[in-house]
UniProtKB/Swiss-Prot annotation:
Subcellular compartments: Cell inner membrane
Keywords assigned: Cell inner membrane, Cell membrane, Ion channel, Ion transport, Membrane, Metal-binding, Sodium, Transmembrane, Transmembrane helix, Transport
Chain positions recorded as Na(+) binding sites: G75, S78
Keyword Metal-binding found: yes
Cited function: Fluoride-specific ion channel. Important for reducing fluoride concentration in the cell, thus reducing its toxicity.
Activity regulation summary: Na(+) is not transported, but it plays an essential structural role and its presence is essential for fluoride channel function.
Transmembrane annotation, as ranges: 4-24, 35-55, 68-88, 103-123
Name of the molecule in the record: Fluoride-specific ion channel FluC
Annotated organism of origin: Paraburkholderia phytofirmans (strain DSM 17436 / LMG 22146 / PsJN)
Membrane-protein topology: Multi-pass membrane protein
Pfam family, one: CRCB
GO cellular component, one term: plasma membrane
Length: 126
């Protein structure tokens, strides 16, 4: 149990720091368009796809590694709460089109990247 707690905690800390770094580096690129949040979510989507498919093909890997990568690292990196707050801010500002676009792009790209991650493992495993 202690290894599981450490795996999630350390992974979560590292993922959160990477998300923070992406925000610092990318959120100022386009005014009003939080690219850091988008990058965090699509990167996490891809890596989660790779991880889910990879761990499914390698059940001998200790479960703590799955907890570290998926629950900790990618859980800390991906940010549904920040995405939600940004969309609500657009709605409060009366920017309904921006809010709708952000929802479609974030969710669509994240799902697409997860599928791409799974497909990557599938192709590399042939």
């Amino acid at each position: 149990m202690y290894w599981s707690i450490l795996a999630v905690g350390i992974g979560g800390a590292l993922g959160s720091l990477f998300r923070w770094f992406l925000g610092i580096r990318l959120n100022g690129v386009f005014s009003g368009l939080p690219l850091g949040t988008f990058a965090a979510n699509v990167i996490a989507g891809y890596v989660i796809g790779v991880a889910v498919a990879g761990f499914a093909r390698a059940p001998q890997i200790a479960p703590e590694w799955r907890l570290f990568v998926i629950t900790g690292l990618m859980g800390g990196l991906s940010t549904f709460s920040t995405f939600s707050a940004e969309v609500v801010q657009r709605l409060q500002d009366g920017r309904l089109g921006w809010a709708a676009g952000e929802i479609v792009i974030h969710v669509g790209a994240s799902l697409l990247m997860t599928m791409l991650g799974i497909a990557t493992v599938s192709l590399l495993s042939r």
